[in-house]
C-alpha cells in the first residue's frame, strides 16, 4: 500500500515538473491554509490563535486597571475661590452629594384625574377637595356666580376638562384643581393621543364646559 502511494506521488511530481502545473493558484493555496488553520484551532493546537487570545485578555485587564485608577483618583480639580470641583476628564462641574440633597422637589403638583377614561366621575369626595372658600379667593366674579348656580359642574370644569393632564402645563394645573387661564379652550386640548377613547373624553369635557359657562346660568 505504501509503495503504491509513493509511486502515485512520484508520478504526480514528475507530471507537474514537466507541465509547469506546479504554479499553484494563490486563491487555492489561501483556501488550503485557512482549512488547515481552522482544523488546528478546532483541535486546540494552533499556537497563533492562543497567542492572540492571551494578548486580548491582557489588553482587557490593562484597560480595566486604567479605568479603576481614573475612578479612584477622584478625577476632579477644585477651582480656586469658586468652591466648584471640575472633572479633569469632561471639564464639567461635579455636584456634591450635599448639594443634591438640598435640591427641592418639584413644587408643581402632579394631578390625579378625578374622571375615568370615559369621562365619568371617579369619586365625589375628590370633587369636594376644591372648597368654595379656596375657589372664592381665586376665581373671577363670573365663575363664582357659576359656582353658586352649579357647583358640581363648575368643579368638573375646573378639575376634569383635561382628564389626564395630557397637553401643556396649564392643562396639568387644571387637573390639579387650579383655575384655567381666560384663554382656555377645551377644543384645543391634545386629545388625539388617546385615539377613539380620546374622542369620548373630549366630547364629555366640552359638554361640561358648555353647561358651566352657558349664558343665563
UniProtKB/Swiss-Prot annotation:
One of its GO terms (cellular component) is nucleus. It is found in: Nucleus; Secreted. Keywords: Nucleus, Secreted, Signal. Coiled coil: none annotated. Residues 1-21 form the signal peptide. Disulfide bonds: none annotated. Disruption phenotype: RNAi-mediated knockdown causes dumpy body shape. Defects in cuticle integrity. GO terms for biological process: collagen and cuticulin-based cuticle development. Its main location: nucleus. Probably acts downstream of the Wnt signaling pathway. This is Protein dao-4. It comes from Caenorhabditis elegans. The gene is dao-4.
Amino acid at each position: 500500500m505504501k509503495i503504491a502511494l509513493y509511486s502515485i506521488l512520484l508520478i504526480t511530481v514528475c507530471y507537474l515538473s514537466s507541465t509547469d502545473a506546479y504554479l499553484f493558484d494563490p486563491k487555492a493555496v489561501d483556501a488550503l491554509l485557512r482549512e488547515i488553520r481552522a482544523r488546528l484551532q478546532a483541535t486546540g493546537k494552533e499556537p497563533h490563535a492562543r497567542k492572540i487570545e492571551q494578548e486580548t485578555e491582557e489588553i482587557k485587564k490593562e484597560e480595566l486597571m486604567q479605568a479603576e485608577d481614573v475612578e479612584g483618583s477622584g478625577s476632579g480639580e477644585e477651582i480656586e475661590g469658586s468652591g466648584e470641583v471640575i472633572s479633569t476628564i469632561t471639564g464639567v462641574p461635579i455636584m456634591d452629594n450635599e448639594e443634591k440633597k438640598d435640591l427641592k422637589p418639584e413644587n408643581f403638583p402632579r394631578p390625579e384625574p378625578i374622571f375615568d377614561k370615559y369621562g365619568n366621575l371617579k369619586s365625589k369626595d375628590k370633587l369636594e377637595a376644591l372648597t368654595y372658600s379656596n375657589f372664592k379667593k381665586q376665581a373671577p366674579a363670573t365663575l363664582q356666580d357659576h359656582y353658586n348656580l352649579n357647583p358640581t359642574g363648575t368643579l368638573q370644569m375646573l378639575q376634569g376638562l383635561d382628564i389626564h393632564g395630557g397637553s401643556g402645563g396649564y392643562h396639568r394645573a387644571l387637573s390639579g384643581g387650579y383655575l384655567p387661564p381666560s384663554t382656555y379652550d377645551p377644543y384645543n386640548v391634545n386629545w388625539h393621543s388617546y385615539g377613539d377613547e380620546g374622542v369620548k373624553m373630549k366630547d364629555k369635557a366640552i359638554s361640561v364646559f358648555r353647561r358651566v359657562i352657558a349664558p343665563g346660568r
